[in-house]
């Protein structure tokens, strides 16, 4: 029974991490894609690395 409890707790923690993903992203955080950033930011290159930045627009 205790193994199931551990698995349950792990799945809850993992789900919480995924659910909290967009809220903990901040401006200038390193990213691999736009999904790593909040909706108002985009994953843009500043020369060396990609970071979450405001979309400069068209």
Curated annotation (Swiss-Prot):
Listed as disulfide-bonded, the cysteine pairs are 25-38, 31-43, 37-52
Which residue positions does the secretion signal occupy? 1-16
GO MF term set: calcium channel regulator activity; toxin activity
Record-level GO cellular component terms: extracellular region
Q: Which domain of life is it from?
A: Eukaryota
* Chief localisation class: secreted
The alphabetized UniProt keywords are: Calcium channel impairing toxin, Disulfide bond, Ion channel impairing toxin, Knottin, Neurotoxin, Ryanodine-sensitive calcium-release channel impairing toxin, Secreted, Signal, Toxin
Subcellular localization: Secreted
The entry's note on the tissues where this protein occurs is: Expressed by the venom gland.
Report residue numbers covered by any propeptide.
17-26
Name the family the entry cites: Belongs to the scorpion calcin-like family. KTX subfamily.
Explain the purpose of this protein: May inhibit voltage-gated potassium channels Kv1.1/KCNA1, hKv1.2/KCNA2, and Kv1.3/KCNA3. May also increase intracellular calcium release through the activation of nuclear inositol 1,4,5-trisphosphate receptors (ITPR) of cardiomyocytes, thereby causing an increase in the contraction frequency of these cells.
In the record's own words, the domains note is: The presence of a 'disulfide through disulfide knot' structurally defines this protein as a knottin.
**What is this protein's record name?**
Putative calcium channel toxin 196
Biological source species: Lychas mucronatus (Chinese swimming scorpion)
């Amino acid at each position: 029974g205790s193994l199931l409890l551990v698995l349950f707790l792990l799945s809850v923690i993992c789900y919480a991490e995924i659910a909290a993903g967009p809220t903990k992203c901040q401006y200038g955080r390193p990213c691999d894609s736009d999904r790593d950033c909040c909706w108002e930011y985009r994953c843009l290159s500043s020369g060396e690395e990609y970071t979450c930045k405001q979309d400069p627009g068209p």
